[in-house]
Amino acid sequence: MGCIKSKENKSPAIKYTPENLTEPVSPSASHYGVEHATVAPTSSTKGASVNFNSLSMTPFGGSSGVTPFGGASSSFSVVSSSYPTGLTGGVTIFVALYDYEARTTEDLSFKKGERFQIINNTEGDWWEARSIATGKSGYIPSNYVVPADSIQAEEWYFGKMGRKDAERLLLNPGNQRGIFLVRESETTKGAYSLSIRDWDEVRGDNVKHYKIRKLDNGGYYITTRAQFDTLQKLVKHYTEHADGLCHKLTTVCPTVKPQTQGLAKDAWEIPRESLRLEVKLGQGCFGEVWMGTWNGTTKVAIKTLKPGTMMPEAFLQEAQIMKKLRHDKLVPLYAVVSEEPIYIVTEFMSKGSLLDFLKEGDGKYLKLPQLVDMAAQIADGMAYIERMNYIHRDLRAANILVGENLICKIADFGLARLIEDNEYTARQGAKFPIKWTAPEAALYGRFTIKSDVWSFGILQTELVTKGRVPYPGMVNREVLEQVERGYRMPCPQGCPESLHELMNLCWKKDPDERPTFEYIQSFLEDYFTATEPQYQPGENL
């Protein structure tokens, strides 16, 4: 969400295959200090989707009822704890997966491996717990602990993680051949997948996936000739012998401490005085973005909005919805200052906006595989927004944030419809992002998930051109007129034709003919691996 100033019919063909696909390029040191991105295991939300737009009085509908393309859905993170609520008497013992430093006087500091009795877990993301080691009680983030006697407590178990996210994690710089993790199978209920980092002369660093199947009697196997009573015994066996796998299991893949769900218990509408603005990161037509600290303890990003940008009551209503949208490719909304000037407090992402990263940061040096992977991450987040019947309305590189190891997260989802500035609400004013907006949205205000798909096609051109302004040499009015007449941007230099064909699908005149984000995600995630089997049979298996 920010100021825009103008400067200047086929299905996808066979996908581009590079001669050598190497591991992702590692970004250099943080621009604003070391910070991590959330790539820890997440759990699936159960139950039917909620139409968030109907709750927030959006004048136009959410996702289109027509889904012209298929594609595999991906995992997404919990909206609330997946554990049973109402535990009494501390019967279930939980163990910490990560260290945690208390942020308030009501919080409980703890170390990885510390055990707890849960006193009260009925209040969502923050549980009241008692440390068995110290006897102290306080609130702990519920996504930092798991039942002590469960498979989730194993360091190598990463839960509901998609194949692509497993590959991103295992291929992080510094990881060696044989590093591994176990996750839930995406394709077979009750089964698991073993993902291992490998190397060969043809592909270089790569990841192999093996399906772990479950026997009727409860045992587990990759090959029927080697069966085990428990997953733990299976993992132990393959750490001692490769036994047909591409490599013996060496060390567990390092995980990254996840973001907590919110800053602390009951820290939603917070006092302005609890925030310290420290480093100005950017400025737009509607406000500024700062790196700062909450409560003297927690690094955050703070978006400050100019008075009059939006009605505080409408913002607070929308923010209540936005904070329920949780996915590891969406920037989490932590807290708000709801009186003008409005402050929006979110996770701090160390590399800043994707636009700045491509134009001025290490993104200038990225090659096509890394750029396609970033597009796939954005499509992953948008596919979640699609499933939740929500709309972004302002999808472009300036509203994507980048963290360590090229992790991308979508920011500012849903805020655009609240802006009250006349130069924006006119839809053709100087501040409106015409070049990213679908014609039916720019001309008639028909914003849907399909207009977001159009914007994603424009965002793809930003990626492959390293941040070039779309429609170079054309002003806003000219763009609107030409697009209405059927003009579409030509294939950017160095962009494979199959990627340009995907862009053209996103730019179909009829919104219902545009692909779903689910399809786009599937297309991009498999862009370089479409000819390979998803699971390896292994040698002599």
From Swiss-Prot:
Localization in the cell: Cell membrane; Cytoplasm, Cytoskeleton, Microtubule organizing center, Centrosome; Cytoplasm, Cytosol; Cell junction
Listed SUPFAM superfamilies: Protein kinase-like (PK-like), SH2 domain, SH3-domain
Residue numbers annotated as active site: 394
Catalytically driven reaction(s): L-tyrosyl-[protein] + ATP = O-phospho-L-tyrosyl-[protein] + ADP + H(+)
Reported phenotype of the disruption mutant: Knouckout mice show reduced OCT2 tyrosine phosphorylation and reduced OCT2-mediated TEA renal secretion. Knouckout mice are protected from oxaliplatin-induced acute sensory neuropathy. Mice are viable, fertile, and display no apparent phenotypes. This lack of phenotype may be attributable to compensatory roles of the other SRC-family members.
Any Gene Ontology biological process: cellular response to platelet-derived growth factor stimulus
Disulfide bonds: none
Class in the EC hierarchy, top level: transferase
Its job: Non-receptor protein tyrosine kinase that is involved in the regulation of cell growth and survival, apoptosis, cell-cell adhesion, cytoskeleton remodeling, and differentiation. Stimulation by receptor tyrosine kinases (RTKs) including EGFR, PDGFR, CSF1R and FGFR leads to recruitment of YES1 to the phosphorylated receptor, and activation and phosphorylation of downstream substrates. Upon EGFR activation, promotes the phosphorylation of PARD3 to favor epithelial tight junction assembly.
Protein name: Tyrosine-protein kinase Yes
